[in-house]
A protein has these predicted regions:
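Conserved, structured core segments of small domains
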Residues: 1-99
Length: 99
């Protein structure tokens, strides 16, 4: 399996999507149902500022699998969120890191 990172960039209008509790609950349930999404979370320029995007680290066999995961996420709204996908590897593969 390959490790992938996804960098999401949000427009300011994405804040309304984030504020929708029903959609947020669906997003959290979706993430929990996909253990291949190893880590994920929102990005802010500074702790006291609004979210401007997100970061995911995923293990998947193909870019297509990663894109499917993105496109089916309840938080993905193409008008308000763009993304870039990159392959990713650890410099110290033998070292285990817990966040």
């Amino acid at each position: 399996m390959t490790r992938w990172t996804v960098i999401f960039k949000d427009t300011p209008d994405m804040l309304s999507i984030r504020a929708d509790k029903t959609r947020r609950d669906a997003h959290i349930a979706y993430v929990r149902a996909h253990p291949e999404l190893l880590i994920g979370g929102g990005l802010k320029p500074n702790p006291d500022q609004e979210f401007c995007g997100a970061l995911w680290v995923i293990e998947a066999n193909s870019r297509k699998e990663v894109e499917t995961l993105i496109l089916n996420d309840p938080f993905y709204v193409p008008e308000f969120r763009s993304y870039e996908i990159f392959t990713w590897g650890k410099i110290l593969e033998d070292q285990i890191t817990t966040l």
